[in-house]
């Protein structure tokens, strides 16, 4: 289960700053759903390569002490309900306010783990600034400087410890501010595997059912499509126990291949499909994407592609998931409208040109069966193992066709490539000065590998590693003849000085 962390507090206490730091973005627009989840932003975050979580920025809770409860009901109650843990942010420079007291009073009423976080304590006496906040009746408080990353890692370790058994919480003294700025600039280590680990991962993925997440905006036909798929296969539908925000996992089999349908809309009785109003939970959808192998994004052909569609697509890409696009409600459209829809898809979805697009009618079943051809193709592309010799040969062909650029008078040299992981496929390239490669050449290599390996339906990632020079720290050792020549030269130099 991917934990969900909600950031709650009044305006200007640093929620967006912390959100941007956790998601490693600059504009806090990681997964923004305007209109549907007003004033709440959703993003992927990682404490390290093994511990992922979803973070929600609730926006500011504004108003007086009397009005705070109303504002919270409008924009933050839903986020608090979705969250596994709440980080209640206050401003250490501004001190305690009536709005802070009202928020704290509400959090005490609900049975939800909450942590008081005093932000903006850099450059001031932190203990003195925090003194007033003990009036809120909390057992502990955590001091951070979100703008500089101080204390953020220790805070996250403490907040996420109940959800990860192997996560060691900080043993630092309460109130102590640690210099943990490595969270600010650190890059997440790429998912790298040895050859043996890559082979083991490939075998594991081939033996498991394909987990397919069906996602999309409300009322695009996700539930209709889910029931159409299940109805065609005549499987027994059951739902696994979970909370109200958990997706339903439905096992099924098609053409001898096992699948698990991750239904974010919930399973409906077949006779009541049209009576059901589709509910949309952002957290449920994002969790489904994280847990899936292949993501099936359903788009409404009768509406323009929205920012919500692009946000969901971007989230799936960032998670490295294989993608298949289903344009639903295609039946009944005249040819002119269909052509306009296709042009709009080409214009706005050019960044996922590797994904197959299907035009379907979930209600009547048109084109639904062909979806599984693309789903299997995408999964195979994401998990098929490619040997080091093949990857190195493709890399050599790419550099022969278009050499790497010169940097400070020296040409960047790529030596060899090997598989670094799957789902999504990762290619690791070793060479000299590879960190100096421009983004344009990296994109060229990515497209070259995709075309050569015929990878469809999945993103591909390339990691670059500088090859170590084995003689870098070793002093030159002269041969016997070179040593004699050196002595003669030194003797000549000394005689000239005399």
Curated annotation (Swiss-Prot):
Q: Which GO terms describe its biological process?
A: ribosome biogenesis
Q: Which domain of life is it from?
A: Bacteria
Q: Which InterPro entries match?
A: AAA+_ATPase (IPR003593), G_ENGA (IPR031166), GTP-bd (IPR006073), GTPase_Der (IPR016484), KH_dom-like (IPR032859), KH_dom-like_a/b (IPR015946), P-loop_NTPase (IPR027417), Small_GTP-bd (IPR005225)
Any idea where the KH-like domain is?
384-468
The residues the record assigns to binding GTP 2 are 216-223, 263-267, 328-331
Q: Does Zinc-finger count among this protein's keywords?
A: no
Which keywords describe this protein according to UniProt?
Answer: GTP-binding, Nucleotide-binding, Repeat, Ribosome biogenesis
Q: Does the keyword Isomerase apply?
A: no
Q: GO molecular function, one example?
A: GTP binding
UniProt: GTP 1 binding residues: 9-16, 57-61, 119-122
Q: Which residues form the EngA-type G domain?
A: 3-167, 210-383
Q: Which family does it belong to?
A: Belongs to the TRAFAC class TrmE-Era-EngA-EngB-Septin-like GTPase superfamily. EngA (Der) GTPase family.
Question: What NCBIfam families does this protein map onto?
Answer: GTPase_EngA (TIGR03594), small_GTP (TIGR00231)
* Quaternary structure note: Associates with the 50S ribosomal subunit.
Tell me, what does this protein do in biology? GTPase that plays an essential role in the late steps of ribosome biogenesis.
- HAMAP family per the record? GTPase_Der (MF_00195)
Q: What is this protein called?
A: GTPase Der
Tell me which species this is from: Vibrio parahaemolyticus serotype O3:K6 (strain RIMD 2210633)
Gene that specifies this protein: der
């Amino acid at each position: 289960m991917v934990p969900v962390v909600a950031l709650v507090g009044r305006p200007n206490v640093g929620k967006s700053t912390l959100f941007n730091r956790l998601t490693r973005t600059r504009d806090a627009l990681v997964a923004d759903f305007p209109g549907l989840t007003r004033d709440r932003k959703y993003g992927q975050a990682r404490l390290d390569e093994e511990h992922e979580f979803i973070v929600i920025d609730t926006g500011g809770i504004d108003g007086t002490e009397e009005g705070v409860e109303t504002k919270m009901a409008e924009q933050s109650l839903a986020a608090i309900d979705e969250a596994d843990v709440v980080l209640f942010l206050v401003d250490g420079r501004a001190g305690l306010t009536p709005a802070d007291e009202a928020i704290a009073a509400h959090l005490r009423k609900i049975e939800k783990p909450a942590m008081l976080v005093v932000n903006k304590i850099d450059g001031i006496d932190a203990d003195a600034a925090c003194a007033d906040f003990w009036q809120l009746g909390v057992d502990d408080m955590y001091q951070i400087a979100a703008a500089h990353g101080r204390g953020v890692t220790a805070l996250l370790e403490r907040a996420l410890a109940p959800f990860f058994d192997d996560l060691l919480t900080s043993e630092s003294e309460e109130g102590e501010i640690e210099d943990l700025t490595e969270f600010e600039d650190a890059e997440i280590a790429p998912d790298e595997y040895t050859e043996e680990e890559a082979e083991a991962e490939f075998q594991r993925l081939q033996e498991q059912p394909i987990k397919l997440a069906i996602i999309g905006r409300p009322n695009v036909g996700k539930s209709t499509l889910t029931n159409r798929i299940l109805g065609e296969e005549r499987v027994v539908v059951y739902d696994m126990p979970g909370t109200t925000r958990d997706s339903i996992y439905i096992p099924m089999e098609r053409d001898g291949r096992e699948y698990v349908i991750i239904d974010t809309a919930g399973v409906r009785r077949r006779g009541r499909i049209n009576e059901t109003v589709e509910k949309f939970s952002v957290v449920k959808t994002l969790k489904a994407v994280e847990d899936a192998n292949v993501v099936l994004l359903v788009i409404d052909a009768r509406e323009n592609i929205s920012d919500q569609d692009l946000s969901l697509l971007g989230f799936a890409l960032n998670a490295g998931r294989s993608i298949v696009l289903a344009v639903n409600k295609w039946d009944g459209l005249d040819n002119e409208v269909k052509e306009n829809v296709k042009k709009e898809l080409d214009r706005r979805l050019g960044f996922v040109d590797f994904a197959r697009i299907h035009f379907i009618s979930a209600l009547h079943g048109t084109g639904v069966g062909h979806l599984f051809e693309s789903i299997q193709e995408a999964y195979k592309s994401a998990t098929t193992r490619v040997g080091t010799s093949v990857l190195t040969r493709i890399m050599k062909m790419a550099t022969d066709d278009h050499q790497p650029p010169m940097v400070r008078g020296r040409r960047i040299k790529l030596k060899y490539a090997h598989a670094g992981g799957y789902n999504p496929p990762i290619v690791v390239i070793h060479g000299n000065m590879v960190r100096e490669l421009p983004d344009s050449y990296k994109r060229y290599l990515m497209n070259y590998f995709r075309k050569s390996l015929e990878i469809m339906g999945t993103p591909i990632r390339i990691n670059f590693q500088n090859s170590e020079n084995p003689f870098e720290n070793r002093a030159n050792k002269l041969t016997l003849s070179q040593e004699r020549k050196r002595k003669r030269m030194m003797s000549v130099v000394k005689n000239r000085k005399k």
